[in-house]
Amino acid sequence: MSWTRVVVLSLLTTLLFLTFSSVVDSAAVRDDSKAGHPKGPARQVFVPESEASNFFKRRSRRSPRSYAELQAEQRVKIAANERWREYNEEQRNEHENYAEEARDESDERSRETHEQIREYHYDGLYPRYHWFH
């Protein structure tokens, strides 16, 4: 029974907090607010009609780009290409290191195996250079 009391108490506390919170006031729909004068974030999203039409007049779809816009776009492309190149170079280096380590381990194992075979087959009666003729 004590856990139900804890749950009910926590729910009531949350409800009380949400009731008096300023976040809920800004999210609630009010009847007395005027739609003509937006406040807060709405003012940043919606602009007057004159500013919106000037924005589209200033830069249409077919208008040539300014030199600054072209330069900024080129800088973004160059930076992206550089990041891509660095990433691929890092991946290639990691793969080369892994392949080199694998080759070294394989060479070491084969060398040890060959040494063991030589020692096993050598009986001391003839020089070693006669083995593989």
Curated annotation (Swiss-Prot):
PTM annotation (4-carboxyglutamate): residues: 69, 73, 82, 86, 89-90, 94, 96, 100-101, 105, 108, 112, 115, 119
Region (Disordered): 87-115
GO terms, biological process: embryonic skeletal system development; regulation of osteoblast differentiation
Secretion signal, residue range per the UniProt entry: 1-26
Residue ranges of the propeptide: 27-62
Record key words, sorted: Coiled coil, Extracellular matrix, Gamma-carboxyglutamic acid, Secreted, Signal, Sulfation
GO cellular component: extracellular matrix; extracellular region
Coiled-coil parts of chain: 80-120
InterPro entries: UCMA (IPR031386)
Role, per record: May be involved in the negative control of osteogenic differentiation of osteochondrogenic precursor cells in peripheral zones of fetal cartilage and at the cartilage-bone interface.
Family of the protein in this entry: Belongs to the UCMA family.
Protein name: Unique cartilage matrix-associated protein
Species of origin: Sparus aurata (Gilthead sea bream)
